[in-house]
Swiss-Prot record:
Protein kinase domain: residues covered: 15-300
Family matches, as Pfam families: IKBKB_SDD, Pkinase
Activity modulation comment: Activated when phosphorylated and inactivated when dephosphorylated.
UniProt xrefs under SMART domains: S_TKc
UniProt source species: Xenopus tropicalis
Family per similarity comment: Belongs to the protein kinase superfamily. Ser/Thr protein kinase family. I-kappa-B kinase subfamily.
Keyword Transmembrane: no
Name of this chain's protein: Inhibitor of nuclear factor kappa-B kinase subunit alpha
Swiss-Prot/TrEMBL GO biological process terms: cellular response to tumor necrosis factor; positive regulation of transcription by RNA polymerase II
Functional summary from the UniProt entry: Phosphorylates inhibitors of NF-kappa-B thus leading to the dissociation of the inhibitor/NF-kappa-B complex and ultimately the degradation of the inhibitor. Phosphorylates 'Ser-10' of histone H3 at NF-kappa-B-regulated promoters during inflammatory responses triggered by cytokines.
Catalyzed reactions: L-seryl-[I-kappa-B protein] + ATP = O-phospho-L-seryl-[I-kappa-B protein] + ADP + H(+)
Originating gene: chuk
Main subcellular localisation: cytoplasm
Region entry Leucine-zipper, spans: 453-474
């Protein structure tokens, strides 16, 4: 059953049309949403009456789409029953919806006028290269690869590129090709222009053209000319030429190198230039480089590029970025030696920080600098600091102006034709954006330094707490030791007249008292504590400082103004207008001045951070030494306490043995003293106890048990005293061993 094309805002059962996503040669692609489930689908419907050939082409696309399943080729899905009808004698095609729009939309953004970022280029190469290989394995040649036929979808935080529009796949009529491809000829391989036999290498040409445009912001070969015009001029190029441009004189120039400016690091530039030479070879047989291990050489080289491990290091002392291709299992020390060669910073003075302020681990390989699955120097950076410096003198010299930018800065009122002005202003936008990004990277480096400082501060706080705790414990033990030795000395003096005396022991105890005073000095941490508290306050102030937050608002505003100027220029007719660059030059000058101001503040703040960190580094060994001294004092104090306690117990033993000698006379320490044998209550005491317990209504059994137990203890004590008396008869005080005083 056939129905008219669906109009905007139309309803098909539970499906509402939400948006028109695109219009092709014969069809419209519209977005539909299911009101009940929220499901989204892209529905392609025919908008014109088609010839029999084109009807076959339409149906063939549907059949091809239904048998493909690859993450980088858009998937076909079931047409909702409510839309399962014919429009202009052909069915609808339902596809997954990709919310990121197409690649053309991304390239048209002013910020991408000089190409995409490195991470975006590498991601695109990986996705589209994988999709093309899959199609070729399925014996499908796309033949119409272009930015409009690449859509973007966010998946788990990553942008995924998908190939769409297989309406001109391999089996399409070759004779009608030129008329069918009106408007997209800029990406077609030369043999398709010439109506010659072709192979999968036509997709290589389109792929290379598209990647070049993503890198430079424009197509590689005379992009301002019509396809049929540049075709005749470019066919003379050498197989290594990947770029052609027209001089002011009208002369055509060829180059084997990517144009500047672009956003690729030098290591990637060299590799991609070689890769593009394979893809943009005019000869379809040589294009792609032949087979290598069963695969086209261009895809082998592409994989090598994508698998490169490159570490990007921002030297915070010079604001320059250094990129290093890491070798397998390269050690961090080897990388640091290479860094020393390029920067002049010795390996012992290098501090390499990740974005979160974590220092690189010297025990791990250099690959710890690279994040798995993350490509491009715009995505991650390692920050290099010189530990021998605490004052960074920035700002540094701004980016150098290109020849054409320098031309308009020298004379901002010079009139230029619109096509030339577009190129110059595109470079101006790129320059302004570059200055802003330079600041952003340096700010991120400052932030890494702040996070590193906070890590050091956390370590400082832990060590301080350990020191304070150890000091407090030592103080408490000293207080106990001093008080106990004072009491011991007092009691010793009290009993000297009738008890035991030893000058050697007394001298040893007084020496202990003096040593305890010295040990107390080890626990004096007041100065260190105050210094640490001052550092904590300084760090809090640095965190509160406006310089700790981004100061690039003015530069971002100037970047937006530059983009607006470029957007206003773009739609103007190139044939009728000339214009000067007064406004754009003003923005350039203001951006340079703005960067100079914010970088002065940034490096002033950074110097304070690094100075504060150096103070912590200098303090840590002092704290460690203080803690060790406290521990040593604590240990020595405990040893003295233990020694004195052993002496006291020895004295107690002597006192016990001497007690029996006192019966011979109070003045003689050698005469045994006969103690009272009855050290426990006598009979009258027992009666008093019995009376007291009876008064309290205690049972007779408990009373009898208590009295019996008392008698047992009395007999035991009497036995011990008799034993002591016997021992004293065999020993005198003068024969006792006092060698323990020397221990």
């Amino acid at each position: 059953m056939e129905k008219p094309p669906v109009q905007h805002g139309a309803v098909c059962g539970p499906w509402d049309m939400k948006d028109r996503l695109g219009t092709g040669g014969f069809g419209n692609v519209c977005l539909y949403q299911n009101r009940e489930t929220g499901e989204l689908k892209a529905i392609k419907s025919c908008r014109l009456e088609l010839s029999m050939k084109n009807k076959e082409r339409w149906c063939q696309e549907i059949q091809i789409m239904k048998r493909l399943n690859h993450p980088n080729v858009v998937k076909a899905c079931e047409v909702p029953p409510e839309m399962d009808f014919l429009v202009n004698d052909v069915p609808h095609l339902a596809m997954e919806y990709c919310a990121g729009g197409d690649l053309r939309k991304l390239l048209n953004k002013p910020e991408n006028c000089c190409g995409l970022k490195e991470s975006q280029v590498l991601n695109l190469m990986s996705d589209i290269g994988s999709g093309i290989q899959y199609l070729h394995e399925k014996r499908i040649i796309h033949r119409d690869l272009k930015p409009e036929n690449i859509v973007l979808q966010e998946c788990n935080g990553k942008t995924v590129h998908k190939i769409i529009d297989l309406g001109y796949a391999k089996d399409l009529d070759q004779g009608s090709l030129c008329t069918s491809f009106v408007g997209t000829l800029q990406y077609l391989a030369p043999e398709l222009f010439e109506n010659k036999p072709y192979s999968v290498t036509v997709d290589y040409w389109s792929f290379g053209t598209m990647v070049f445009e993503c890198i430079a912001g424009f197509r590689p070969f005379l992009h301002n000319m019509q396809p049929f015009t540049w075709h005749e001029k470019i066919k003379k190029k050498d197989h290594k030429h990947i770029y052609a441009y027209e001089e002011m004189s009208g002369e055509i120039r060829f180059s084997s190198y990517l144009p500047q400016p672009n956003n690729l690091c030098s290591i990637i530039v060299d590799k991609i230039e070689t890769w593009l030479q394979l893809l943009l070879n005019w000869d379809p047989i040589q294009r792609g480089g032949g087979m290598d291990c069963g695969r086209p050489q261009c895809f082998v080289l592409m994989d090598q590029i994508l698998n490169l491990k490159i570490v990007h290091i921002l030297n915070m002392t010079s604001a320059k970025i250094h990129s290093f291709h890491l070798q397998p299992e390269e050690s961090l020390h080897t990388l640091q030696s290479r860094i020393e060669t390029e920067t002049g910073i010795s390996t012992c003075n290098q501090e390499l920080l990740l974005e979160m302020g974590v220092s690189l681990d010297p025990r791990k390989p250099a690959s710890q600098c690279v994040i798995d699955g993350v490509k491009g120097w715009d995505s991650y950076m390692v920050y290099l600091f010189d530990k021998s410096k605490t004052v960074y003198e920035g700002p540094f010299q701004s980016r150098s102006l290109s020849e054409c930018l320098n031309y308009i800065v020298q004379d901002s009122k010079v009139q230029l034709p619109i096509p030339q002005l577009r190129k110059v202003w595109a470079e101006a936008v790129h320059y302004v954006s570059g200055l802003k990004e330079d600041y952003s990277r340096l700010f991120q480096g400052q932030r890494a330094a702040m996070l590193s400082l906070l890590r050091f501060n956390t370590n400082l706080t832990k060590m301080k707490n350990t020191m304070v705790s150890a000091s407090q414990q030592l103080g408490a033990k000293l207080q106990f030791f001093k008080r106990s030795i004072e009491i011991d000395l007092e009691r010793y003096s009290d009993q000297m007249a009738y008890g035991i005396s030893s000058e050697k022991m007394l001298r040893a105890w007084k020496e202990m008292e003096d040593k305890a005073v010295c040990f107390g000095k080890a626990g004096k941490i007041h100065f260190l504590d105050e210094t640490i508290m001052g550092l904590h306050t300084e760090i809090v102030e640095l965190q509160k400082s406006p310089c700790a937050r981004r100061q690039g608002d003015v530069m971002e505003h100037l970047e937006q103004r530059a983009m607006e100027l470029y957007k206003q220029l773009k739609p103007r007719s190139p044939d009728k207008a000339y214009s000067d660059s007064t406004e754009m030059v003003k923005i350039l000058v203001q951006t340079v001045q703005g960067q100079d101001r914010v970088l002065k503040e940034l490096f002033g703040h950074l110097s304070k951070l690094l100075g504060c960190k150096q103070k912590i580094i200098d303090l840590l060994p002092q704290i460690e030494m203080t803690v060790n001294n406290i521990k040593e004092a604590d240990s020595s104090l405990m040893q003295m306490q233990a020694k004195r306690q052993r002496e006291i117990w020895h004295l107690l033993k002597i006192a016990c043995t001497q007690s029996s000698a006192r019966s011979l006379g109070p003045a003689s320490v050698e005469t045994p003293i006969t103690p009272r044998t009855s050290a426990w209550p006598d009979q009258s005491s027992s009666q008093a106890l019995f009376s007291m317990l009876t008064t309290k209504d205690k049972s007779r059994e408990i009373l009898r048990h208590t009295i019996d137990k008392n008698s047992d203890y009395q007999k035991l004590l009497s036995s011990l005293i008799l034993q002591t008396q016997t021992t004293m008869e065999q020993n005198s005080l003068m024969s006792l061993d006092f060698s323990w005083l020397n221990k």
